[in-house]
Regions:
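Condensing-enzyme catalytic core of the thiolase-fold
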Residues: 1-287
Length: 287
């Protein structure tokens, strides 16, 4: 039968953000973001820019990843993206793809000058595009490296001030080594202490559009507790990942929790659309 007006608005991407503004009575910038897997971080980046531009005093950034139809899963399986044994083993030699999961998350951003002791500080972020790579959905290591360096520059940080990175880490044969190489190039040259690298997807799967929000929650807990979570399902490190990270312990991929990574933490989210995002996070009041 004919679609109801509720269905027409209920499954419209533009209305997803508009509905929040309607319910909360917000009149500032309101944008729905779809850059595939990087959507959450691009939304956070956009909210931070709006605050810095004086367009609003605070911003609500939300992300939703729901599996309401079988077609996307069938397509991802046909493309060889999904783990055949249903386990996302990021960084592991036996990694064979990711597992789709669901998630919903929301956060409020406001200027640090408003006062928020003990809160998480977004000191800098960057959004870029893979551009020309091996294929439309293939990662581009050079673009990733440029993204990480750009985010550090916005934050005014040197690589040595970054104690860890919450990586995109999909557990794919191409994605993991590529990302390891870009992190090593941006963060690991001349380090005196290892860069602690993690990925939430090994624990909860890939929430896709909401995956960046899951990463943000993990980074928040790590920074507020001064501890780095271990990489679940990591048994034998992928030789290509080891090679790209470099010799001499330039980066640590802990299978058990670490006491501390120290300093700021990077957070990555890469969309298979080619749109990629990275941000630098720390605790308000920390150096």
């Amino acid at each position: 039968g004919p679609r109801s007006v509720y269905a027409a608005t209920g499954d419209n991407l533009a209305v997803a953000a508009g509905r929040l503004s309607f319910v909360l009575g917000l009149q500032g910038p309101c944008v729905s973001v779809d850059t595939a897997c990087s959507s959450a971080l691009v939304a956070l980046h956009s909210g931070a820019l709006a605050i810095r531009a004086g367009e609003c005093r605070s911003a609500v950034a939300s992300a939703v990843g729901l599996k309401l139809a079988p077609q996307p899963t069938l397509g991802a399986a046909a493309a060889g993206m999904l783990s055949v044994d249903g386990r996302c083993k990021t960084w592991d030699k036996g990694a064979n793809g990711y597992v789709r999961s669901e998630g919903v998350g929301s956060t409020v951003l406001r200027a640090v000058s408003d006062g928020a002791s003990g809160a998480l500080a977004l000191s800098g972020s960057a959004v870029r595009q893979d551009g020309r790579s091996a294929s439309l959905t293939a990662p581009n290591g050079s673009a990733q490296r440029g993204l990480l360096v750009a985010a550090m520059a916005v934050a005014g940080l040197e690589a040595s001030a970054v104690g860890g990175v919450e990586a995109h880490g999909t557990g794919t044969a191409l994605g993991d080594p590529t990302e390891a190489g870009s992190m090593a190039a941006a963060y690991c040259a001349g380090r005196e202490s290892a860069l602690a690298v993690g990925a939430a997807k090994a624990g909860i799967g890939h929430a896709e559009a909401a995956s960046g929000m899951a990463g943000l929650c993990k980074v928040a807990q790590q920074l507020l507790r001064s501890a780095v979570a271990g990489n679940t399902k990591l048994r034998v490190l992928n030789p290509l990942v080891r090679e790209r990270l470099g010799a001499g312990g330039a980066a640590a991929l802990p299978s058990q929790p670490l006491a501390s990574a120290g300093g700021a933490c990077g957070l990555s989210s890469f969309g298979y659309s080619g749109s990629i995002a990275h941000m630098m996070l720390s605790v308000v009041g920390s150096s």
